[in-house]
Amino acid sequence: KATQDVKADMESARPMDRLVCGDVGFGKTEVAVRAAFKAACDNKQSAVLVPTTVLAFQHYQTFRDRLKDFPVRVDYLSRARSAKQTKQVLEDLETGKIDIIIGTHKLIGKNVKWHDLGLLIIDEEQKFGVSTKEKLRKMKSNVDTLTMSATPIPRTLQFSLMGARDMSIMRTPPPNRYPI
């Protein structure tokens, strides 16, 4: 249902602002992969913002592996990349060669230029500070936004409950999921 909600939001006239809540291993990342793929099919770039370098690389591997059979270019940006690699990624992002970029705070830096950003995915929003969120607000005026969290902060949850933000709750694990 969360995937259907996101798809419907992305096809509506107003920009999506949806919170997807679900326990660890319930499929939030899969919802994000599908949303980013839909954005790429619509010739829009997607940015996946994560709080740590390790998570950036894990998500990069997941997105890359899930989309390897499609003409979608996935890359990542974090402090683990060399200056040369970072420069190349930033150039490719600006020229539109990268469809899906996954990264840490580096994604909201002044030197990041987008070709046509259409979707912003924020994983674990509660781990980002106020200044990061302010930069995100400036970045996402006409961009679909998907926030994923297993433990949303009260303010985020309140916005969803008030109706200022849409919310999908993943209550059941995917079939064949092994317990963690």
Where are the regions a protein language model picked out?
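Pre-Walker A segment
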Residues: 1-47
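Post-DEXD/H (motif II) to motif III coupling segment of the RecA-like Helicase ATP-binding lobe
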Residues: 57, 114-119, 124-180
